[in-house]
Amino acid sequence: MSGRNQIIGALTIGQSPRTDVIPEIQKFFGDAEILQAGALDGLSRAEIDALAPEAGSGDVLVSRLSDGSWATMAEAKLIPLLQRQAEALCASGAKLLVLLCTGKFPDVLRVGVPVVYPQRLLYAVVPVLSGGRRVGVVNPDAKQLEQSQRNWGDALENVFVMAANPYQQDTDWDAVAETLAEERVELVVLDCIGYTRKVKERIQEKTGKPVILPRTLLARVVGELL
């Protein structure tokens, strides 16, 4: 594939456009055009609230809405909405879909083009880079910690999980870094597309440890396909 005249479909589990994400990663895609769509596009707040997770409803996901706020959703409820938007992106000419979410999705999107799931990249790369050392994983919401511990515990020998919301203006990133340092982690994973390069740099500076940012990991890998 050549970057020139290629069309990439960027599919968020929240609402598009992701003005907090795409400007930071577009440079990795060369001349490729990026089309955006979101599972929650066109939904009212009441309809979005109806997607909230219930006890025992499976994995919990968090994403940004177009007004800058965020929503918490059950993965299972999102899948039909994602499928609809994936089909729309392909109908608009997308030759490759990129999911803007690090959730542990099954291979559920049925479209005629490749789909890149960031979680699969993370679970392939992080165990290699950690080399058995203690890894700190930061998730957006405390409701995700049990699933994060379970999922990452299957991939890593020694993991610590914590919550810090990338969409909340008053999140104390210095306190997050302090907790990670106290836990003696040797590698940090910011387990959400919503975390920014600025957050990565802040935590890296405060902990002195390498920090993996999913949005740029995803973009660099996709860039190799163009």
Residue spans of the language-model regions?
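Short, flexible loop segments at boundaries between secondary-structure elements
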Residues: 42, 131-132, 167-169, 211-226
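N-terminal glycine-rich phosphate/adenylate-binding segment common to multiple enzyme folds
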Residues: 72-119, 189-196
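Conserved mixed alpha/beta catalytic, RNA-binding, or beta-rich assembly cores of soluble enzyme
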Residues: 98-152, 157-170, 174
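N-terminal glycine-rich anion-binding loop in soluble enzyme alpha/beta folds
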Residues: 2-73, 139-170
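A short, flexible N-terminal coil/short beta segment enriched in small residues
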Residues: 5, 37-44, 78-86, 119-143
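Hydrophobic alpha-helical
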Residues: 96, 172-173, 186-207, 214, ...
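A short, acidic, amphipathic alpha-helical segment used as a generic capping/interface helix at domain edges
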Residues: 82-85, 169-184
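Short hydrophobic/aromatic-enriched beta-strand-loop microsegments
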Residues: 32-37, 114-120, 156-163, 207-216
